[in-house]
Amino acid sequence: MKTGASGKKALVVVDMLNDFVRPGAPLEVPETRAILPALRRRIRKARRDGELVVYVCDSHRKDDPEFARMGWPPHAVEGTPGAGVVASLAPEPGDVVVEKRTYSGFHGTTLHFLLRGHGIRSLTLAGCVTNICILYTAADAAMRGYDATVDERFVAGLAPDAHAFALDQMEGVLGVRVVRRPGRKAPRR
């Protein structure tokens, strides 16, 4: 069943940006490169099936207080190549790009209004970082009543334990549907 812009489903691709994906990037997340092939296939499938594909992208001002407060190096500074979606996953006509300045794709953005405007109630979240922007976007999606799914094949974390913790929190606390890789178990409740 095709749902797309008139229907019920969206694929939300979070922060698959040059400054997170490229080797040597300011905030490199090496695991992002491991998920690229599967995520590329998932994006193609979403487009083919009529799902709305939304890219939620970190976009900081050069003097963003997050850098000093959190100790992050400057990254995804608006207008720089580092803030662009990695070329192999580049948005296509019909896809939507939403810029964010915080960890959540919903906080201070138009994402909720965009999704509601398209009648979308079901989201699959993909991208990075599992224990930061995926977790906080999933939390806000759940609090807004979306049916959210996170498939472990399409998300990357900074460290295996933080990645696993975030998946457990999304599933056990937020009610997000988490699709585990083979051999991985859901947390006990």
Task: Give residue ranges: language-model regions.
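Active-site-adjacent betaalpha module
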Residues: M1-A10, A38-D49, P73-R189
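Active-site flanking residues adjacent to catalytic metal/cofactor-binding acidic residues
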Residues: V14, C57, E152
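Acidic-leg catalytic submotif of subtilisin-like serine proteases
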Residues: A10-L17
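Metal-dependent catalytic neighborhoods of phosphoester/phosphodiester hydrolases
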Residues: D64-R69
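A short alpha/beta connector and helix-capping loop motif
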Residues: G7, A25-D58
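Solvent-exposed loop/turn segments at secondary-structure junctions
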Residues: S59-K62, V155-A156
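Short, well-ordered beta-to-alpha junction loops that form the rim of enzyme active sites
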Residues: C57-S59, C128-V129
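Short, glycine/acidic-enriched loop or turn micro-motifs at the edges of active sites
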Residues: N18, R22
